[in-house]
């Protein structure tokens, strides 16, 4: 599979406590099949962060890759927006 055909997702980092691993929550909206109301869905993915660049609260782009561990199937591509520290 070519790199440009792999799944690419945007999400927010909710945990960076593991070494070289981040937890990213991806939020999507779907219509209810019967009532048509927009419903928010969220799913957490573990992603490989080789250089420990991403911090908690950052908006990141992750890409599908080969299995890197028992739970990791994505890798960090870029940090789109850094978190604002208050």
Swiss-Prot record:
The keyword RNA-binding applies. GO terms for cellular component: cytosolic small ribosomal subunit. It holds the Pfam family Ribosomal_S17. It comes from the Bacteria. SUPFAM superfamilies: Nucleic acid-binding proteins (SSF50249). One of its GO terms (molecular function) is rRNA binding. GO terms for biological process: translation. Keywords: Ribonucleoprotein, Ribosomal protein, RNA-binding, rRNA-binding. One of the primary rRNA binding proteins, it binds specifically to the 5'-end of 16S ribosomal RNA. PANTHER family: 40S RIBOSOMAL PROTEIN S11 FAMILY MEMBER, SMALL RIBOSOMAL SUBUNIT PROTEIN US17M. Part of the 30S ribosomal subunit. Belongs to the universal ribosomal protein uS17 family. This is Small ribosomal subunit protein uS17. The gene is rpsQ.
